Amino acid sequence: MSAIQVKQVVKQYKNGVQALNGISLCVEQGEIFSLLGQNGAGKSTLLRILTTYLQPTSGRITMLEKDLCRDAASLRSQIACVAQQTSIDTYLSLEENMLLQSRLYRIPKRDAEKRMETLIVDFGLEPYRRYPVSSYSGGVKRRLDIALNMMTNPKILFLDEPTVGMDVQSRIAMWGMMRKIRDDFGVTIFLTTHYLEEADQLSNTVCIMKDGKEVTQGSPAQLRSLLRQNSIEITFSSEAEARKGCGILKEQMSKEILLRAEKLLIYTQTPQSDIEAA
């Protein structure tokens, strides 16, 4: 089941700048989805739209089976977003930061304390309880920021370049934390990143975007195949027709087929023979 479906979304600002140019993508529930792209590709704009800070100019977004624009208020309680700038208060203790988050969302105190203890242990934050938050390293502050956003028990967690500026050890610890959130808590993670290695190591699905539009989307293995193999791209009149064509071709061909909006990508070393066989 899809957690997020983005269809032909356009975002044009009042100054005429078009940040998104008809982007389409699909995020499945319970996966780590990485959005990979350079500065200016449109990642931040899409993230702001998905977290209800901006409205798209056109297109449609479905999140958790609800229309994002129409049901934004009800969806806000089911998602959490960790920005590049941490939102923790360095004048509060670790526990105070986490319990403050729970009070903002009106979580009962007993439930909040139980949730807090689980997150502190599971995310390896217990050794830091005795130290002031102001003394934490950047990596530990980022992990605490994610933990306090998990206090609300979100169904989707948005992470905006969570490992930027981290050393190797901190980055590896963060990767482990993200896997645990997906595997043990069942939370869908939508991750933006500059790092190809990070997307490859963590993701169930990677979407590469450029100039406000997706270039391709698939598993890391599919994207590696795209780089090393010949491919055929078939464009249909609609996404529905593309899905129908995908089903027919999968019955006739043994090659890997990737569905991307109204297009199909067929990966093959011998494209001509596969076309004749179909």
What are these regions (language model features)?
Residues 38-42:
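Walker A (P-loop) phosphate-binding loop of ABC-type ATPase nucleotide-binding domains
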Residues 99, 103, 110-128:
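Conserved ABC ATPase "signature" region
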Residues 51:
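Helix-to-loop junction immediately C-terminal to a conserved catalytic motif
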Residues 157-160:
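Catalytic Walker B motif of ABC-type/P-loop ATPase nucleotide-binding domains
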Residues 59-70, 74-75:
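Conserved ABC transporter NBD signature motif
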Residues 176-269:
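ABC transporter nucleotide-binding domain
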